[in-house]
């Protein structure tokens, strides 16, 4: 049977393949279809989403090149589109890697040496996925396209590439660069582009790239972003993710058909001591009742209502003041000789401005940065991102901050709104590889006791226990937005410990 190999994948005549497989044809298509799992509380009128690892173009049906072995039984005769790749300049440049990073580099390099090589790297947040990928770029010496989800991550990639591989010509591809039509791998060695821009490009744009790196690859499951896979099939592809199969609806499984099963590396021995300060907050009756849409509780609308409580906003401000005081007045007590930073997470963008205004009134001379200038001007400014690397307080949404944002001086988190998903990535913002291990990590978690969302705290407990962080409980209310003394409710060193204490763990613990 004849087939073609192109940037869209393996193309086979639809009718001939259907005739050849007969009843197995339907089974094949079903096996390559991912159907979203219905989530608790999901309205029945919302259609269940499906995504397929095949696409139809005219008389042909295209499959990911990764699946070509499944067609070997048909003695396929492939017509391959020729691709000519130039080699990048070979300059001996060394930069340090941890042992686990070097082992993974060797493994990835071996896999990507083969034509149409694929590798899906699963490495926890903060452990150096970017540095591993840059080492692969240096070894393969192919013109490379790096696809990232946000401008913040794009800037981090540019900075890291420029630092580690200064001999290469590196450029950022964004909406402004789109006007420069000749900006391709002929002019640059490595191009770092944002998915929202690149997914609109024709397949000819991707032709000169011998290697494509997909940062946060698990996020490419969305209907629009997923289309990128049908334009890069001829390239070697390296996917990077800290949470490759973590979506509640299971839609990120579609990525496996293109990249293969995620491959984990041996976890490093670096540990960060820390603890959780869980505040049971009793909100004002006017703000704690659930908001229902189509007879189902809406988490987003309920959170929006919770944050209309001025006392709850003040509680967050008070906790920020408490942490800042600990960090600056008595830094030696917390395992450091200098102040360090606080990240305040909220659920959605409009809350960033609310908390920024509230914090600004209390912190007159403290640098507070909100990198997501997108809430005002449609994009993140380079200035805001640069300021964030020295700021004492950073405000982020969960959706923006859970991605590969790196601020190594940040060691405390305040979760200003409830959260259930992506907690591994959220905590990863204060446990970056290469940051100071001596500094105690502190997580402030507010549990709204009268809200239907209060049960989400138990999902967070699971992650805290996995990290080995003891949990200290205290209380506050709309009448008294200052938290009470702490009570130890879980101790990683004594599972049954329910002793009362007001003393946080020491750095040595």
Swiss-Prot record:
Induction comment from the UniProt entry of this chain: Expressed in the late phase of the viral replicative cycle.
Short sequence motif named DEAH box, residue ranges: 215-218
EC number: 3.6.4.13
Keyword NAD: no
Pfam assignment, any one: ResIII
Binding site for ATP: 123-130
Catalysed transformations (reactions): ATP + H2O = ADP + phosphate + H(+)
Coiled-coil zones: none
InterPro entries: Helicase/UvrB_N, Helicase_ATP-bd, Helicase_Restrict-Modif_Enz, P-loop_NTPase
Segments forming domain Helicase ATP-binding: 110-262
Keywords from the UniProt entry: ATP-binding, Helicase, Hydrolase, Late protein, Nucleotide-binding
SUPFAM superfamilies to which the protein is assigned, alphabetical: P-loop containing nucleoside triphosphate hydrolases
Top-level taxon of the source organism: Viruses
GO molecular function (one): ATP binding
Family named by the database record: Belongs to the DEAD box helicase family. DEAH subfamily.
The protein's name: Putative ATP-dependent RNA helicase QP509L
